[in-house]
Amino acid sequence: MKENYDVVIVGSGAAGLYGALQFSDKQSVLVISKRNAEFSNSSLAQGGIAAVLDKENDDPKLHIEDTLIAGKYKNNPKAIEVLVNEGPSDVLRLRELGVEFDSDPSGKMLMTLEAGHSRHRIVHHKDFTGKAVTDTLIEIVKSKSNIDFVEDTLVFSVDKAQNGFYIGMLNSDHSITTVSCSYCILATGGIGRVYKYTTNSAIATGDGITFARNLGAKLMHLDRIQFHPTAFAAEKDRERFLISEAVRGEGAVLLNCYGERFAQNYDERGELAPRDVVSEAIIRESMRTNSENFYLDITHKSPDFVRERFPMIY
């Protein structure tokens, strides 16, 4: 590790890793991972990546509209346009880099359906897409001569300097290091771990939000926290094992304690309504039945299909 870099990236999930690869070999980059990079929140993502790649059956305008509806039209339109318009080329780039998205015999990427989407536009690698993406990117990033990669290192301060930033780090050996950089990218992910129960990795503690605020950034919509509706029941465990959105995309239905479907009673989109809507439906049904027992039923699919499509969950 050097004393000065052109760019320091705080966070080693998909965003941080992919961002590191956007710089030329002449620019020095430092990527800092709070723990072993293999345990990022991105590596836990199961379902896949939404992108309009099937122009015959899908359209970017539909993807934009789906996103606006899911966000109750409080979204940032410019951010949505970037997501929708740049997403397809980024997915194709990931494939070029070596990510093996599930494909048919002809090589065409398979796309599934997920909640909030009106079309099949989710590319995936079985039910561990995040791991497939991050494992590929980690290998490439670590091979780059212009990129230094440090793991098990906690960034505790990001301060303005005359020509950039100072980054304060607590290393794995408990020593403290400070490096300077011209530019700093905060890619630290979400804040799921501040809640009692979560499917998030232990590192999702909102560090980047704090750094940005301390540097003068204006924060908004901090109440818009996304909760995943489905996880394995584990009463004594804070960490819950995620059951992918894609399971419902493949037709799984939610059942209450009486074995009855109920999601459609709260929203006509049923199990494929946006996550906040499905989560609210589960809570309201729990209050109605005075029970916290719920089931996700995919028995209409064969065991072989479930084993092949969702090997990690199985």
Roles of regions detected by a PLM:
Residues 51-83:
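Glycine-rich active-site loop/strand segments that organize a redox cofactor
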Residues 7-31:
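N-terminal Rossmann-like FAD-binding beta1-loop-alpha1 element of flavoenzymes
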Residues 24-46, 55-56:
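Glycine-rich FAD pyrophosphate-binding loop
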Residues 37, 211, 217-314:
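An anion/pyrophosphate-binding glycine-rich loop and adjacent beta-alpha core
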Residues 77-88, 121-139, 150, 198-206, ...:
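Short beta-strand to alpha-helix junction loop
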Residues 95-175, 183, 187, 231-234:
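Conserved redox-cofactor binding core of oxidoreductases
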Residues 70-110:
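Rossmann-like flavin
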Residues 8-10, 179-189:
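Short hydrophobic core segments
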